[in-house]
Amino acid sequence: VIEIGFTETMVEDAIGQPDSVNRTTYSYYVREQWVYSEGNYRYIYLEDGVVTAIQNKG
């Protein structure tokens, strides 16, 4: 189970490494979208290494 506030390490420990990462760098922070494509797609959104949103598709 992934929750808002998890760190990158906590996510990787829970569900493994993402299949791909989309990264956007802003002036003061980095936003990433981690994509897991096994089964139903799952998207994990992180800002500065902390989960801010979780999206499940399917």
Residue ranges: model-predicted function:
Residues 1-58:
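Residues within mature, well-folded domains
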